[in-house]
């Protein structure tokens, strides 16, 4: 039995119209994956912003220093994660749009180009990773990362 192109395998409609793109399982999976990554990044960004505020404005110097340590540790991680995932997400969006994703009509190709450069800005992610591993993780004899791991568990 042939199915009409543009109809999902689980389509209930018998008429000739195509289904919405979200009805296709692979597209739905891709969109939900993109959404979950973005929401996770947003939550991490809010947490890091809160730690930045604490590091600048808290009355207690010990708490202020701990927050500053977390910001110092997590900034290169967040930069690398957000820029790498941004490139992946826009690439996936281009895939979802199919051939239209490569045309200027939809704007996805411009977003992809704009996002592809971000891992290079402000120091490439590989240079940031070297700085993280060889300088920030061993800073204060590794106490910062130990503290961070213990609050995360």
Feature map (PLM): residue ranges:
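Flavin-dependent oxidoreductase catalytic core characteristic
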Residues: 1-153
């Amino acid at each position: 039995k042939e199915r009409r192109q543009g109809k999902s395998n689980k389509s209930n409609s018998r008429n000739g119209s195509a289904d919405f793109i979200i009805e296709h399982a692979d597209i739905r999976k891709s969109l939900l994956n993109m959404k979950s990554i973005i929401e996770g990044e947003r939550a991490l960004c809010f947490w890091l912003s809160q730690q930045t505020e604490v590091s600048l404005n808290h009355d207690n110097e010990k708490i202020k220093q701990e927050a500053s340590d977390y910001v110092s540790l997590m900034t290169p991680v967040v930069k690398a994660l957000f820029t790498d995932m941004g490139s992946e997400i826009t690439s996936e969006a281009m895939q979802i749009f199919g051939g239209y994703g490569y045309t200027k009509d939809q704007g996805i190709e411009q977003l992809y180009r704009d996002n592809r450069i971000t891992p290079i800005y402000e120091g490439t992610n590989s240079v940031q990773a070297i700085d993280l591993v060889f300088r920030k993780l061993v800073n204060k004899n590794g106490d910062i990362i130990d503290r961070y791991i213990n609050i995360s568990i």
